[in-house]
């Protein structure tokens, strides 16, 4: 088993770039881990059709840093830190990317089934909107307001209970 843990595998990004990494790093992804189980030791490159090279390299960087972390149990009640928006310092620095890359990382983490990375990405977005008004959130994410003033008033009245007071 030790030989399999240190073996290398090749991933092929959506733009056709092959990236060779340690199997242990790749297995942070449940999708890749299951694919490897299904393929056996065929040595074939594993296609990652939904993730381009730059995003895949960023995801691999995160997986390398976290390769020794215990696997996610999938039980959120057991792991209470999932309920906060606290993010480790390394992960905060890792997520200091432009919005497009941040959202691509979140999509890749979801597709590759890397729950811990998905959590970090979602917490990063949550921290970006925490304590902001709808107008500030629209500005942060460059979202155009398509409500009429009447619709906006109605929404405010219906959601008055949720306002900070």
From Swiss-Prot:
The keyword Disulfide bond does not apply. Induction: By fluconazole, an azole-derivative widely used for the treatment of fungal infections of the skin and its appendages. Keywords: Ubl conjugation pathway. InterPro entries: SKP1 (IPR016897), SKP1-like (IPR001232), SKP1-like_dim_sf (IPR036296), SKP1/BTB/POZ_sf (IPR011333), Skp1_comp_dimer (IPR016072), Skp1_comp_POZ (IPR016073). Residues 106-165 are annotated as: Interaction with the F-box domain of F-box proteins. Pathway: Protein modification; protein ubiquitination. GO terms for biological process: protein ubiquitination; ubiquitin-dependent protein catabolic process. SUPFAM superfamilies: POZ domain, Skp1 dimerisation domain-like. Essential component of the SCF (SKP1-CUL1-F-box protein) E3 ubiquitin ligase complexes, which mediate the ubiquitination and subsequent proteasomal degradation of target proteins. Controls sulfur metabolite repression, probably by mediating the inactivation or degradation of the metR transcription factor. Component of the SCF (SKP1-CUL1-F-box protein) E3 ubiquitin ligase complexes. Belongs to the SKP1 family. This is E3 ubiquitin ligase complex SCF subunit sconC. The gene is sconC.
